[in-house]
Regions:
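Short S/T/G/P-rich N-terminal loop/turn motif that feeds into the first structured element of a domain
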Residues: 10, 18-19, 129-130
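Short, low-complexity N-terminal intrinsically disordered segments enriched in polar/charged residues
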Residues: 14-53, 147-156
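Short hydrophobic/aromatic-rich beta-strand segments that constitute the beta-sheet cores
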Residues: 57-58, 105-106, 136
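Beta-strand secondary-structure signal
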Residues: 105-109, 124
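A solvent-exposed, acidic/Ser-Thr-rich amphipathic alpha-helical stretch
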Residues: 26-31, 44-102, 111, 117-118, ...
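A short, structured loop/turn motif at beta-sheet edges
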Residues: 96-103, 127-133
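Short beta-strand edge/turn micro-motifs at domain boundaries
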Residues: 120-147
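Sec-dependent signal peptide recognition
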Residues: 1-7
Length: 156
């Protein structure tokens, strides 16, 4: 009887097994892929669901942006409406480093194609595991417009 009580007490206080580093990295990459899909269907709220609300820090163009809501408002204002305004977003070359059981850093590249305009850049993102979900707490972007290839002169 005492052994049964001790066994039940041990089960009741047992911590869930820690996820493997590979599964944590996969969960982070899944968060980014979910965000990418949301952007590509024009769902900016869905895109922003990957960021910690309200205290995420955004850095872009050498400036701090106005938090979660300010960034959502910016995306809706500058990229909302017609699909050609939001374009197609693709994240690639992503590398995840686990810093602690609840913290990770991702560095990767992205490409945003909006009609003839193509913007590429690098993202550095700090993730924190909050209530079992990986969320971005700091996002730094450096971007540049890709120059279109020169057109060949017409032959006389």
């Amino acid at each position: 009887m005492i052994r049964s009580v001790v066994a039940l007490a041990a089960l009741a206080t047992a911590q869930p097994a820690a996820a493997s580093p590979q599964s944590e990295k996969a969960a982070i990459l899944d968060t980014v892929r979910t965000m990418e899909a949301a952007w590509n269907r024009g769902d900016f709220r869905g895109y922003m669901a990957g960021f910690k609300n309200p205290d995420v820090v955004f850095v872009s163009g050498g400036k701090f942006q106005a938090g979660w809501q300010g960034t959502l408002d910016h995306y809706i204002r500058d990229y909302g409406g017609l699909p050609e305004r939001s374009g197609q977003l693709h994240f690639y070359n992503m590398k995840v480093d686990l810093l602690a059981p609840d913290a990770a850093m991702l560095i990767g590249q992205y490409r945003l194609t909006r009609g003839p305009r193509v913007t590429e850049g690098v993202n550095t993102r700090l993730f924190k595991k909050v209530r079992g979900h990986w969320l971005i707490t700091m996002n730094h972007v450096s971007a540049y417009d890709v120059e279109p290839p020169p057109t060949a002169p017409a032959k006389p």
